[in-house]
């Protein structure tokens, strides 16, 4: 009977989507002139907020301005980017190195901005990769990926990457439970044999560098999303779960049988105590840690061999389970840290837990059994309240700092505003269509900036001019400064956004670097003056020490290269001015171009396969004589005796 109900719900969702505005979009009067004025940013003026929006299957992180919705930059993180040579040049290839080898693609999901005292501080953005479990740190000085750490004992790194209120930890859960350690076992033996690991990655407060501190071994549920405690609940982390049935097939039905799943409350302060007491097991685990240096402009890749593991079933006080209806997706903590909102995708109401009640229930041992040795708290003992009949298919909740919560509803395609404490719905606005995540700048912190809300929709249909079968994902901007939400803007996004993080521009923009100081360039092949340019042969390897400046390369004529050589072009941009990058591309190179920022050195490899004279040129327009910024390489037969030489202006 229940299986039929689930199938009916899925069918209803499908019919809802198919019926969306079949006659096409009616644009007349869709946005009032006042709304257009609110998103207009005059030429030469700045947006008031940054938005960092994940790319999902693009693997990247996009930077937008609010309220204009203008795209400023796509930061390559987990996928190669030929425009910026990320993953192609010799300096960044190892950023995509994993224990599985070089992986040129990733699935980026949940960005989170670093925090100090529970307030976003604008230094770094952390973002998770779902497919090959990893966490990346993006520098908001350079808007480049500074670090990627792989997560062992994990599969489907979804309940990530959220930071504690002083960025002590960035946390990574696992969507899929797997055998830990991995071994050959029948999938049908899932129950009781598959486990999950919740990873706590320590962050250096000065450099931002990450280190996997410990993992908490958990029952074989699916861990969907997570958020940190804050304020009064600082020191705890909360994870939503589904598939507490431990099903291994047809999960849309078999993982939807229990009336309640769990929100797991993890006491990471207690975990630190257990680590100090030595109550952990060191488990073999191979994972790769990649760090990019702004001094050497290169990546250092390290393979780690072990991890400290705490077994939640054997360590009292480490984890408690709070029953939550029904397949909760979002697990969101309000700015005070008192309320934990569980968005049960298949529930007719929304459950809100109380942190204070949870502590009291623990103290009074108000348990309703256990799961694999972990206490289950009584549902009524932690319940703060329920939001009744808010909508269909609740997913995610953010907060405005004024006592209001905002939740997305996928099936009924809307954002719903409700009051904390009274649990009453006070406003709702449609989205177009089937909204997933939402973001309020600072809405995942102790200090939300409750001016704007961005809804990230999963279905676009007729919102934009058609572009063939694949349609861009739609985002919508709402003004939430008043009592009622107001739709201001539709804007397209890159990939499939799963979450976003935002902050006022004043918090972020001061960190941005204008150029790299040439005297601080410690790249081993840096050439800081045209007097030092040269070409060096080492067997079949040839190293070209090259410079670029408006409007020429030095050297720009090279001879003595032979078929079968491996030629490394190490190009240093000598400019010391803002917004003067140089590019370079070589005919026949089986890599991307380079795009080199002022003061930076980058390298591409060219392996000539034909005799001849082959040109290279600057790919980034830099001056009135940009077209003249070019050169030639002469390639001779393998057995030739042409002398290796190089020149600029025949000198």
What are these regions (language model features)?
Residues 1-7:
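Bacterial N-terminal signal peptides that target proteins for export
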Residues 20-534:
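Predominantly soluble domains enriched in secretory-pathway, periplasmic, or organellar proteins
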Residues 147-148, 570-604, 624-631:
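Histidine- and aromatic-enriched segments that form or immediately flank copper-ligand environments
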Residues 533, 597-651:
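Extracellular/periplasmic metallocenter environments
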Residues 515-545, 639-651:
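Extracytoplasmic entry segments of secretory-pathway proteins
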Residues 536-566:
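N-terminal edge beta-strand
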Residues 8-16:
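Bacterial N-terminal signal peptides
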Residues 318-319, 385-386, 556-559, 591-596, ...:
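Beta-strand-rich interaction surfaces with strong enrichment in secreted/lumenal proteins
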């Amino acid at each position: 009977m229940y299986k039929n109900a689930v199938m009916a719900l899925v069918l209803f969702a499908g019919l809802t989507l198919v019926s969306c505005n079949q006659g096409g979009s009616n644009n007349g009067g869709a946005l009032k002139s006042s709304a257009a004025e609110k998103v207009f940013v005059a030429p030469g003026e700045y947006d008031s907020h940054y938005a960092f929006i994940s790319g999902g299957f693009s693997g990247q992180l996009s930077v937008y301005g609010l309220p204009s919705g203008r795209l400023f930059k796509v930061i390559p993180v987990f996928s190669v980017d030929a425009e910026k040579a990320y993953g192609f040049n010799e300096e960044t290839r190892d950023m995509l190195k994993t224990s599985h080898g070089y992986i040129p693609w990733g699935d980026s999901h949940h960005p989170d901005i670093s925090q100090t005292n529970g307030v976003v501080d604008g230094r770094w953005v952390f973002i998770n990769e779902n497919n090959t479990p990893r966490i990346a740190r993006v520098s908001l000085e350079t808007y480049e990926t500074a670090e990627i750490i792989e997560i062992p004992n994990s599969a489907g790194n979804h309940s990530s990457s959220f930071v504690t209120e002083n960025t002590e930890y960035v946390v990574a859960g696992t969507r899929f439970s797997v055998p830990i350690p991995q071994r050959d076992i029948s999938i049908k033996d899932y129950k009781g044999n598959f486990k999950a690991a919740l990873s706590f990655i320590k962050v250096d407060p000065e450099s931002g560098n990450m280190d996997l501190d410990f993992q908490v071994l958990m029952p074989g549920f699916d861990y969907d999303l997570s958020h940190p405690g804050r304020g009064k609940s600082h020191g705890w982390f909360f994870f939503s779960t589904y598939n507490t049935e431990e099903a291994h097939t047809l999960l849309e039905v078999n993982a939807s049988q229990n009336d309640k799943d769990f929100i797991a409350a993890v006491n990471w302060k207690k975990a630190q105590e257990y680590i100090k007491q030595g109550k952990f097991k060191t488990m073999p685990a191979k994972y790769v840690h990649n760090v990019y240096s702004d001094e050497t402009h290169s990546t250092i890749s390290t393979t780690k061999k072990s991890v400290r593991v705490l077994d939640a079933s054997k360590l009292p006080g480490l984890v408690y389970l709070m029953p939550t209806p029904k397949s909760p997706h979002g697990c969101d903590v309000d700015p005070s840290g008192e309320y934990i909102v569980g968005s049960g995708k298949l529930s007719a109401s929304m459950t809100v837990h109380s942190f204070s009640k949870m502590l009291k229930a623990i103290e009074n041992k108000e348990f309703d059994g256990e799961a694999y040795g972990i206490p289950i708290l009584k549902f009524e003992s932690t319940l703060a309240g329920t939001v009744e009949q808010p909508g269909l298919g609740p997913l995610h909740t953010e907060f405005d700092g004024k006592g209001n919560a905002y939740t997305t509803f996928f099936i009924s395609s809307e954002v719903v505003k409700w009051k904390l404490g009274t649990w009453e719905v006070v406003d709702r606005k449609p989205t177009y269509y089937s909204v997933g995540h939402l973001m309020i700048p600072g809405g995942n912190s102790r200090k939300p900036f409750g001016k704007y809300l961005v809804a990230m929709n999963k279905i676009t249909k007729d919102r934009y001019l058609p572009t063939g079968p694949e349609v861009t994902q739609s985002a919508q901007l709402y003004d939430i400064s008043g009592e009622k939400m107001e739709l201001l803007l539709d804007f397209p996004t890159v990939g499939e956004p799963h979450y976003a993080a935002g902050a006022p521009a004043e918090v972020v923009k001061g960190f941005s670097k204008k150029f790299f100081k040439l005297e601080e360039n410690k790249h081993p092949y840096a050439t800081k003056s045209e007097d030092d340019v040269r070409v060096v042969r080492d067997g079949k390897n040839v190293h070209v020490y090259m410079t670029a400046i408006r409007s020429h390369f030095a050297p720009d004529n090279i001879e003595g290269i032979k078929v079968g050589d491996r030629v490394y072009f190490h190009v240093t941009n000598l400019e010391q001015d803002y917004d003067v990058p140089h590019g370079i591309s070589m005919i026949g190179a089986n890599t991307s171009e380079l795009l080199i920022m002022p003061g930076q050195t980058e390298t591409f490899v060219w392996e000539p396969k034909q005799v001849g004279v082959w040109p290279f040129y600057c790919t980034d327009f830099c001056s009135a004589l940009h077209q003249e910024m070019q050169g030639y390489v002469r390639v001779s037969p393998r057995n030739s005796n042409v002398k290796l030489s190089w020149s600029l202006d025949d000198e």
